From Swiss-Prot:
Binding site for a ubiquinone: H201
Entries under InterPro entries matching the protein: Cyt_b/b6_C, Cyt_b/b6_C_sf, Cyt_b/b6_N, Cytb/b6-like_sf, Cytochrome_b, Cytochrome_b_C_euk/bac, Cytochrome_b_N_euk/bac, Di-haem_cyt_TM
Function: Component of the ubiquinol-cytochrome c reductase complex (complex III or cytochrome b-c1 complex) that is part of the mitochondrial respiratory chain. The b-c1 complex mediates electron transfer from ubiquinol to cytochrome c. Contributes to the generation of a proton gradient across the mitochondrial membrane that is then used for ATP synthesis.
Ranges annotated as spanning the membrane: 33-53, 77-98, 113-133, 178-198, 226-246, 288-308, 320-340, 347-367
Name of the protein: Cytochrome b
Gene Ontology terms for molecular function: metal ion binding; ubiquinol-cytochrome-c reductase activity
Family: Belongs to the cytochrome b family.
Cell compartments where the protein resides: Mitochondrion inner membrane
Quaternary structure (record): The cytochrome bc1 complex contains 11 subunits: 3 respiratory subunits (MT-CYB, CYC1 and UQCRFS1), 2 core proteins (UQCRC1 and UQCRC2) and 6 low-molecular weight proteins (UQCRH/QCR6, UQCRB/QCR7, UQCRQ/QCR8, UQCR10/QCR9, UQCR11/QCR10 and a cleavage product of UQCRFS1). This cytochrome bc1 complex then forms a dimer.
Protein residues bound to heme b b562: H83
């Protein structure tokens, strides 16, 4: 008799995706981040759901309802901080996952990669609207500044901003709207993640060498399920260390001050995971130019398959490209640091140089280096 998991219509899908899935035998821990992102998503949906049960999306009570969750609700503080720090873990895993894709040439699976970029945009949008909900100073002013960027769009910009605000400033309608988005967006993310997996399983996983591994595949379970469980335990360990010892380490102290439209904080900045994009936005003096650079800093990922000039897929055997890749990582860390600094000398010029370098590495240096490496192969 055939095993039920191979015959039952629903279990067959699960079986083909997580149990009998043929997987390359040499994929490293860099391939763990997909499952970790799944865990983060489920964690965020669950903690978010429990927070929503006690949250009030009214400008007069939003801030105090979050305080109420932390003080009066059973284990409310741990749910709140797991949600806040879970977002940070989500983005750490996301950046590692995208970095892995860039390093090992996974972007050559076009459909999977493009859905992944759409997923990245959706997660960033969800994190942004979610950050507005506690209605602290940084929530309010972050919402005002970032939504106001849309006014740079010619002709329809101003109308678009007022439509998102639900009036002529960030107010009750904005908060209610922004409470509706983090409710629906995670489910859209879940659907996109399923499509992402569907496309991935059409081609099979890439591997560190970038060489087709059809001759050497092993079943996903038990080899990689046990590996994913270890990754999950490490993720939960780091998350709980953050939550239980330094829950406010990655937050902004200004967000413990209730939102006040009459008092602008001295330095408006988003959460740490948006700082690199914020630094690129600020490095351009023109409003529309800054917005375009901000969008392009992420959208540039779509171009990666077109910019791939190497005869080899992975960077495993390309030392010059490896060097460039790590310079790019250092540049992104520099941008993240600059995004959190005030707009003054020398931070402004460092931010501008780092922004130019970011685009220059991806659009110019990487393709040229790949072509040089191709020629070196002939020797």
């Amino acid at each position: 008799m055939t095993n039920i998991r191979k015959t039952h219509p629903l279990m067959k899908i699960v079986n083909n995706a997580f149990i009998d899935l043929p997987t390359p035998s040499n994929i490293s821990s860099w391939w763990n981040f997909g499952s970790l992102l799944g865990i983060c998503l489920v964690l965020q949906i669950l903690t978010g759901l429990f927070l929503a049960m006690h949250y009030s999306s009214d400008t007069t009570t939003a801030f105090s309802s979050v305080t109420h969750i932390c003080r009066d609700v059973n284990y409310g503080w741990i749910i709140r901080y797991m949600h806040a720090n879970g977002a940070s873990m989500f983005f750490i895993c996301l950046f590692m996952h995208v970095g892995r894709g860039l390093y090992y040439g996974s972007y050559n699976y076009l459909e999977t990669w493009n859905i992944g970029v759409i997923l990245l945009f959706t997660v960033m949008a969800t994190a942004f609207v979610g950050y507005v909900l506690p209605w602290g100073q940084m929530s309010f002013w972050g919402a005002t500044v970032i939504t106001n960027l849309l006014s740079a769009i010619p002709y329809i910009g101003t109308n678009l901003v007022e439509w998102i605000w639900g009036g002529f400033s960030v107010d009750k309608a904005t908060l209610t709207g922004f409470f509706a988005f983090p409710f629906i967006l995670p489910f859209i993310i879940m659907a996109l993640a399923m499509i992402h997996l569907l496309f991935l399983h059409e081609t099979g996983s890439n591997n560190p060498t970038g060489i087709p591994s059809d001759t050497d595949k092993i079943p996903f379970h038990p080899y990689y399920t046990i590996k994913d469980i270890l990754g999950a335990l490490i993720l939960i360990l780091f998350l709980m260390l953050l939550v239980l010892f330094t829950p406010d380490l990655l937050g902004d102290p200004d967000n413990y001050t209730p939102a006040n439209p009459l008092n602008t904080p001295p330095h408006i900045k988003p959460e740490w995971y948006f700082l690199f994009a914020y630094a690129i936005l600020r490095s351009i003096p023109n409003k529309l130019g800054g917005v375009l650079a901000l969008v392009l800093s992420i959208l540039i990922l779509i171009l990666m398959p077109l910019l791939h000039m190497s005869k080899q897929r992975s960077m495993m055997f390309r030392p010059f490209s490896q060097c460039l890749f790590w310079i790019l990582v250092a540049d992104l860390l520099t941008l993240t640091w600059i995004g959190g600094q005030p707009v003054e000398h020398p931070f402004t010029i460092i931010g501008q140089l780092a922004s130019i370098l970011y685009f220059f590495i991806i659009l110019v240096l990487m393709p040229i280096t790949s072509m040089i490496e191709n020629n070196l192969l002939k020797w």
